[in-house]
Amino acid sequence: MNFFYYKDFYQLSEISVGQHYYWQISNFQVHGQTLMTSWFVISLIMIIAFLSNLNMKKIPLAKSFQNLAEFVTEFILDLARTQVGKEDYLNWVPFLGAVFLFIFVSNWGGALLPWKLLELPNGELAAPTNDINTTVALALLTSFSYFYAGISKKGISYFGRYVQPTPFLLPINVLEDFTKPLSLSFRLFGNLLADELVIAVLVSLVPLFVPVPLMLLGLFTSAIQALVFSTLAGAYIGESVEDHH
Protein backbone atom coordinates (compact mmCIF):
# COMPACT_ATOMS: atom_id res chain seq x y z
CA MET A 1 0.00 0.00 0.00
CA ASN A 2 1.35 3.39 -0.92
CA PHE A 3 0.26 6.99 -1.10
CA PHE A 4 -1.53 6.55 -4.43
CA TYR A 5 -3.57 3.65 -3.06
CA TYR A 6 -4.97 5.83 -0.28
CA LYS A 7 -5.37 8.72 -2.68
CA ASP A 8 -7.80 6.63 -4.76
CA PHE A 9 -9.92 5.97 -1.67
CA TYR A 10 -9.99 9.65 -0.77
CA GLN A 11 -10.96 10.51 -4.33
CA LEU A 12 -13.92 8.16 -3.99
CA SER A 13 -14.89 9.82 -0.72
CA GLU A 14 -15.05 13.32 -2.17
CA ILE A 15 -18.52 14.69 -2.80
CA SER A 16 -19.61 17.92 -4.43
CA VAL A 17 -23.04 19.02 -3.26
CA GLY A 18 -24.79 21.56 -5.46
CA GLN A 19 -22.08 21.64 -8.16
CA HIS A 20 -23.19 20.72 -11.65
CA TYR A 21 -21.76 20.30 -15.12
CA TYR A 22 -24.07 22.46 -17.22
CA TRP A 23 -25.03 21.96 -20.85
CA GLN A 24 -26.39 24.89 -22.79
CA ILE A 25 -29.38 23.82 -24.92
CA SER A 26 -30.88 26.83 -26.70
CA ASN A 27 -31.68 29.29 -23.89
CA PHE A 28 -31.73 26.64 -21.19
CA GLN A 29 -29.05 25.26 -18.91
CA VAL A 30 -29.42 21.58 -17.98
CA HIS A 31 -27.45 19.34 -15.64
CA GLY A 32 -25.26 17.43 -18.06
CA GLN A 33 -24.01 14.84 -15.57
CA THR A 34 -27.58 13.93 -14.62
CA LEU A 35 -28.56 13.44 -18.25
CA MET A 36 -25.49 11.28 -18.90
CA THR A 37 -26.13 8.97 -15.96
CA SER A 38 -29.86 8.86 -16.74
CA TRP A 39 -29.12 7.72 -20.29
CA PHE A 40 -26.73 5.13 -18.89
CA VAL A 41 -29.40 3.76 -16.53
CA ILE A 42 -32.06 3.67 -19.26
CA SER A 43 -29.63 1.96 -21.67
CA LEU A 44 -28.71 -0.62 -19.03
CA ILE A 45 -32.38 -1.44 -18.39
CA MET A 46 -33.03 -1.76 -22.13
CA ILE A 47 -30.01 -4.04 -22.63
CA ILE A 48 -31.11 -6.35 -19.81
CA ALA A 49 -34.66 -6.38 -21.20
CA PHE A 50 -33.31 -7.26 -24.66
CA LEU A 51 -31.11 -10.06 -23.30
CA SER A 52 -34.06 -11.41 -21.32
CA ASN A 53 -36.03 -11.92 -24.54
CA LEU A 54 -33.29 -13.81 -26.37
CA ASN A 55 -33.70 -17.58 -26.60
CA MET A 56 -36.68 -17.62 -24.28
CA LYS A 57 -37.51 -21.00 -22.75
CA LYS A 58 -40.69 -22.37 -21.26
CA ILE A 59 -38.77 -23.16 -18.07
CA PRO A 60 -35.96 -20.58 -17.76
CA LEU A 61 -32.56 -21.45 -16.37
CA ALA A 62 -31.99 -20.52 -12.74
CA LYS A 63 -29.14 -18.11 -13.59
CA SER A 64 -30.49 -16.33 -16.65
CA PHE A 65 -31.75 -12.90 -17.62
CA GLN A 66 -35.12 -14.44 -18.48
CA ASN A 67 -35.52 -15.78 -14.94
CA LEU A 68 -34.58 -12.39 -13.51
CA ALA A 69 -37.00 -10.60 -15.84
CA GLU A 70 -39.86 -12.95 -14.93
CA PHE A 71 -39.20 -12.45 -11.22
CA VAL A 72 -39.21 -8.65 -11.59
CA THR A 73 -42.34 -8.74 -13.77
CA GLU A 74 -44.23 -10.86 -11.24
CA PHE A 75 -43.13 -8.54 -8.46
CA ILE A 76 -44.37 -5.44 -10.32
CA LEU A 77 -47.64 -7.16 -11.28
CA ASP A 78 -48.26 -8.02 -7.64
CA LEU A 79 -47.41 -4.48 -6.53
CA ALA A 80 -49.75 -2.93 -9.10
CA ARG A 81 -52.57 -5.38 -8.29
CA THR A 82 -52.28 -4.67 -4.58
CA GLN A 83 -52.10 -0.87 -4.83
CA VAL A 84 -54.25 -0.01 -7.85
CA GLY A 85 -56.86 -2.76 -7.63
CA LYS A 86 -57.73 -5.82 -9.67
CA GLU A 87 -59.93 -3.92 -12.13
CA ASP A 88 -57.46 -1.30 -13.34
CA TYR A 89 -53.98 -2.50 -12.40
CA LEU A 90 -52.97 -3.88 -15.81
CA ASN A 91 -53.16 -0.40 -17.35
CA TRP A 92 -50.59 0.87 -14.85
CA VAL A 93 -48.09 -1.98 -14.78
CA PRO A 94 -45.83 -0.34 -17.44
CA PHE A 95 -45.76 2.98 -15.59
CA LEU A 96 -45.12 1.52 -12.14
CA GLY A 97 -42.56 -0.89 -13.58
CA ALA A 98 -40.68 1.90 -15.35
CA VAL A 99 -40.64 4.06 -12.21
CA PHE A 100 -39.49 1.22 -9.97
CA LEU A 101 -36.76 0.00 -12.32
CA PHE A 102 -35.41 3.47 -13.06
CA ILE A 103 -35.15 4.39 -9.37
CA PHE A 104 -33.81 0.97 -8.35
CA VAL A 105 -31.09 0.83 -11.03
CA SER A 106 -30.22 4.50 -10.46
CA ASN A 107 -29.84 4.01 -6.71
CA TRP A 108 -27.78 0.84 -7.00
CA GLY A 109 -25.68 2.34 -9.78
CA GLY A 110 -24.90 5.29 -7.53
CA ALA A 111 -23.89 2.96 -4.70
CA LEU A 112 -21.87 0.41 -6.69
CA LEU A 113 -20.28 2.28 -9.60
CA PRO A 114 -17.21 4.49 -8.96
CA TRP A 115 -18.69 7.53 -10.72
CA LYS A 116 -16.24 9.93 -9.05
CA LEU A 117 -13.26 8.41 -10.88
CA LEU A 118 -14.65 9.95 -14.10
CA GLU A 119 -13.68 13.59 -13.96
CA LEU A 120 -15.82 16.43 -15.29
CA PRO A 121 -14.93 20.10 -15.80
CA ASN A 122 -17.27 20.90 -12.90
CA GLY A 123 -19.33 18.82 -10.50
CA GLU A 124 -19.23 15.03 -10.55
CA LEU A 125 -21.12 12.05 -11.89
CA ALA A 126 -23.61 10.50 -9.49
CA ALA A 127 -26.88 8.60 -9.50
CA PRO A 128 -29.65 10.44 -11.41
CA THR A 129 -31.79 10.28 -8.27
CA ASN A 130 -29.10 12.23 -6.43
CA ASP A 131 -30.31 15.31 -8.33
CA ILE A 132 -33.40 17.00 -6.88
CA ASN A 133 -34.57 17.81 -10.42
CA THR A 134 -34.86 14.10 -11.21
CA THR A 135 -36.87 13.28 -8.09
CA VAL A 136 -39.16 16.27 -8.61
CA ALA A 137 -39.73 15.21 -12.23
CA LEU A 138 -40.63 11.67 -11.12
CA ALA A 139 -42.99 13.05 -8.46
CA LEU A 140 -44.72 15.42 -10.91
CA LEU A 141 -45.07 12.58 -13.41
CA THR A 142 -46.75 10.54 -10.68
CA SER A 143 -49.11 13.44 -9.91
CA PHE A 144 -50.09 13.81 -13.56
CA SER A 145 -50.63 10.06 -13.73
CA TYR A 146 -53.11 9.84 -10.88
CA PHE A 147 -54.99 12.90 -12.15
CA TYR A 148 -55.17 11.26 -15.58
CA ALA A 149 -56.26 7.94 -14.05
CA GLY A 150 -59.11 9.53 -12.12
CA ILE A 151 -60.36 11.84 -14.87
CA SER A 152 -60.14 9.20 -17.62
CA LYS A 153 -62.26 6.80 -15.55
CA LYS A 154 -64.73 9.14 -13.84
CA GLY A 155 -64.72 12.26 -15.97
CA ILE A 156 -65.64 15.53 -14.27
CA SER A 157 -67.12 13.64 -11.33
CA TYR A 158 -63.56 12.84 -10.26
CA PHE A 159 -63.32 16.27 -8.65
CA GLY A 160 -66.16 15.33 -6.32
CA ARG A 161 -63.57 13.60 -4.16
CA TYR A 162 -62.41 17.00 -2.91
CA VAL A 163 -65.66 17.55 -1.00
CA GLN A 164 -65.84 14.07 0.48
CA PRO A 165 -66.77 13.13 3.13
CA THR A 166 -67.68 16.76 3.86
CA PRO A 167 -67.24 20.05 1.94
CA PHE A 168 -65.32 21.49 4.91
CA LEU A 169 -62.38 19.30 3.89
CA LEU A 170 -62.04 20.98 0.47
CA PRO A 171 -58.96 23.11 1.38
CA ILE A 172 -57.21 20.14 3.01
CA ASN A 173 -57.93 17.83 0.07
CA VAL A 174 -56.63 20.43 -2.40
CA LEU A 175 -53.52 21.02 -0.28
CA GLU A 176 -52.90 17.27 -0.20
CA ASP A 177 -52.41 17.23 -3.97
CA PHE A 178 -49.57 19.73 -3.57
CA THR A 179 -47.93 17.93 -0.66
CA LYS A 180 -47.88 14.51 -2.36
CA PRO A 181 -45.26 15.38 -5.02
CA LEU A 182 -43.25 17.35 -2.45
CA SER A 183 -43.10 14.42 -0.03
CA LEU A 184 -42.28 11.94 -2.82
CA SER A 185 -39.45 14.01 -4.28
CA PHE A 186 -37.81 15.19 -1.06
CA ARG A 187 -38.06 11.78 0.63
CA LEU A 188 -36.21 10.09 -2.23
CA PHE A 189 -33.64 12.86 -2.69
CA GLY A 190 -33.01 13.36 1.03
CA ASN A 191 -32.48 9.70 1.83
CA LEU A 192 -30.05 9.16 -1.04
CA LEU A 193 -28.08 12.33 -0.36
CA ALA A 194 -27.82 11.55 3.35
CA ASP A 195 -26.64 8.01 2.65
CA GLU A 196 -23.97 9.24 0.23
CA LEU A 197 -22.77 11.95 2.62
CA VAL A 198 -22.45 9.52 5.54
CA ILE A 199 -20.48 7.00 3.48
CA ALA A 200 -18.27 9.75 2.01
CA VAL A 201 -17.39 11.05 5.48
CA LEU A 202 -16.63 7.56 6.82
CA VAL A 203 -14.50 6.65 3.80
CA SER A 204 -12.49 9.85 4.25
CA LEU A 205 -11.92 9.03 7.93
CA VAL A 206 -11.41 5.26 7.75
CA PRO A 207 -10.89 4.38 4.07
CA LEU A 208 -10.71 0.59 4.38
CA PHE A 209 -13.15 -1.85 5.97
CA VAL A 210 -15.34 0.18 8.33
CA PRO A 211 -17.57 1.78 5.62
CA VAL A 212 -18.32 -1.59 3.94
CA PRO A 213 -21.26 -2.56 6.22
CA LEU A 214 -22.77 0.90 5.72
CA MET A 215 -22.36 0.56 1.96
CA LEU A 216 -24.28 -2.73 2.12
CA LEU A 217 -26.91 -1.01 4.24
CA GLY A 218 -27.02 1.72 1.61
CA LEU A 219 -27.85 -0.87 -1.06
CA PHE A 220 -30.72 -2.12 1.09
CA THR A 221 -32.11 1.36 1.77
CA SER A 222 -31.74 2.25 -1.92
CA ALA A 223 -33.93 -0.71 -2.85
CA ILE A 224 -36.43 0.25 -0.14
CA GLN A 225 -36.64 3.80 -1.51
CA ALA A 226 -37.48 2.47 -4.98
CA LEU A 227 -40.15 0.24 -3.46
CA VAL A 228 -41.62 3.04 -1.32
CA PHE A 229 -41.82 5.47 -4.25
CA SER A 230 -43.49 2.99 -6.63
CA THR A 231 -45.82 1.72 -3.88
CA LEU A 232 -46.99 5.23 -3.06
CA ALA A 233 -47.40 6.01 -6.77
CA GLY A 234 -49.60 2.93 -7.13
CA ALA A 235 -51.56 3.83 -3.99
CA TYR A 236 -52.25 7.36 -5.28
CA ILE A 237 -53.45 5.98 -8.61
CA GLY A 238 -55.59 3.44 -6.75
CA GLU A 239 -57.21 6.24 -4.73
CA SER A 240 -58.02 8.11 -7.95
CA VAL A 241 -59.75 5.19 -9.67
CA GLU A 242 -61.59 3.69 -6.70
CA ASP A 243 -65.31 4.27 -6.35
CA HIS A 244 -66.36 6.63 -3.56
CA HIS A 245 -69.73 6.09 -1.98
From Swiss-Prot:
Pfam families named in the record: ATP-synt_A
Source organism, top-level taxon: Eukaryota
NCBIfam families (alphabetical): ATP_synt_6_or_A
PANTHER family, per the entry: ATP SYNTHASE SUBUNIT A, CHLOROPLASTIC
Protein name stated in the entry: ATP synthase subunit a, chloroplastic
Transport among keywords: yes
Biological role: Key component of the proton channel; it plays a direct role in the translocation of protons across the membrane.
Taxon lineage: Eukaryota, Sar, Rhizaria, Cercozoa, Chlorarachniophyceae
Entries under CDD domains matching the protein: ATP-synt_Fo_a_6
A cellular component annotation (GO) from this entry: plasma membrane
GO molecular function, one term: proton-transporting ATP synthase activity, rotational mechanism
InterPro entries reported in the protein's UniProt record: ATP_syn_F0_a_bact/chloroplast (IPR045082), ATP_synth_F0_asu (IPR000568), ATP_synth_F0_asu_AS (IPR023011), F0_ATP_A_sf (IPR035908)
Its membrane topology: Multi-pass membrane protein
Native source organism of the sequence: Bigelowiella natans
Transmembrane segments: 34-54, 93-113, 132-152, 197-217, 218-238
Homology family: Belongs to the ATPase A chain family.
Entry annotated with the keyword Heme: no
Subunit comment: F-type ATPases have 2 components, CF(1) - the catalytic core - and CF(0) - the membrane proton channel. CF(1) has five subunits: alpha(3), beta(3), gamma(1), delta(1), epsilon(1). CF(0) has four main subunits: a, b, b' and c.
Alphabetized UniProt keyword annotations: ATP synthesis, CF(0), Chloroplast, Hydrogen ion transport, Ion transport, Membrane, Plastid, Thylakoid, Transmembrane, Transmembrane helix, Transport
Localization: Plastid, Chloroplast thylakoid membrane
